[in-house]
UniProtKB/Swiss-Prot annotation:
Family: Belongs to the UPF0316 family.
Organism per entry: Staphylococcus carnosus (strain TM300)
DNA-binding recorded as keyword: no
Protein name (Swiss-Prot/TrEMBL): UPF0316 protein Sca_1484
Membrane topology: Multi-pass membrane protein
Protein localization: Cell membrane
Membrane-crossing residue ranges in chain numbering: 8-28, 40-60, 66-86
Cell membrane recorded as keyword: yes
Length: 189
């Protein structure tokens, strides 16, 4: 640590990097906790606290330099963004995608089932007449692929996606057909 303390630029860099690492862990741990991954969250929190103690120690030992506090705050901000990007890549959990279409001829439910998605569909009535409504549950990592697939098949479909909090019964209890979902390319539709 004496090498870092002797060089003010190294000190700034160390404080910044340590705080980015700390807040990244903090953000990921919070998201893991909210999604119910409590044991993984506990392991991440152990690493988080170790990093926090080191970073805070560096700042507290050098409070007389305002730039160190700025580096700490910037590291905090960047850490939030990095943590959120990591969570996006992990894509934990499931999404419910609701699709409303007026085009019955496309037989969208059958096409999506053939691609491995579980689809529940039913008739509905909107301002402009009869519609077909579909409810599709998909792992979050396939949400964008599903949205692209729907746009390829029916570009006028009305689509809403939201996070599913609790699952019980139905298609997903039998097992996700992830291999089938991964196997197709949206350009081939």
């Amino acid at each position: 640590m004496s090498v870092i303390s002797a060089n003010p630029w190294l000190m700034l860099l160390a404080i910044f990097v340590i705080n980015v690492a700390y807040v990244t862990c903090l953000t990921v741990r919070t998201i893991l906790t909210l999604k119910g991954y409590r044991y993984v969250a506990a392991a991440v929190s152990f690493i988080e606290v170790l990093i926090y103690i080191i970073g805070l120690g560096l700042v507290m030992a050098n409070l007389d330099k305002f730039q160190n506090i700025i580096a700490y705050a910037l590291g905090f901000s960047v850490g939030i963004i990095v943590g959120m990007k990591i969570e996006e890549k992990l894509a934990l959990g499931y999404s419910v995608v609701n699709v409303t279409t007026a085009n019955y001829e496309l037989d969208l439910p059958t096409q999506l089932r053939n691609l491995g998605y579980g689809v529940t569909h039913f008739p509905a009535y909107g301002r402009d007449g009869e519609r077909l409504v579909m409810q599709i549950l998909t792992p979050r990592r396939f949400e964008l692929k599903l949205m692209d697939t729907i746009k390829q098949i029916d570009e006028k479909a009305f689509v809403i996606a939201y996070e599913a909090r609790t699952l019980h019964g139905g298609f997903w209890v039998k097992g996700v057909r992830s291999k089938k979902l991964k196997a197709y390319d949206t350009d081939e539709i």
